[in-house]
């Protein structure tokens, strides 16, 4: 008598914790020590972070992948807020979710009228004071978001990121002595990772 094949075990749900590990996995290239501390704070192993990232990539590239908005709603639940937003000629909605690892931040998805996610990144929570950004010394890893750096050191010029979840900004910023320097800042998921200063190693 032929043996029945073993029943396929249902996949465990992809949780908000898993999503936070995905955010960290992309940041580990630039700031491994910060990521390690955050991972311990979440009570997750390196293996768990890698597995979360593997499952995330599989979801993104699945033949019948969900639309980004549906995917985030399934993983993160109902958005904390949904707000109309006008960016140039583009009318869209901003969906915000809390991120327990960073209580002062929110994960924002900008959705165009056709339902396509136009942008997905971390922003400062509404009503939460942002960092004081005046000199190069203030631009420490994880200290600010893309829009905060762009406002503090305007005019800033967007730079092409090295991956879909990475952004760059070019601007000038003073050092402690007031001498201005040309800078290139790198962000992952909208959060500052490092700043390169022209003429410095």
Where are these regions (language model features)?
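A short, surface-exposed helix-loop junction/capping segment
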Residues: 48-54, 124-134
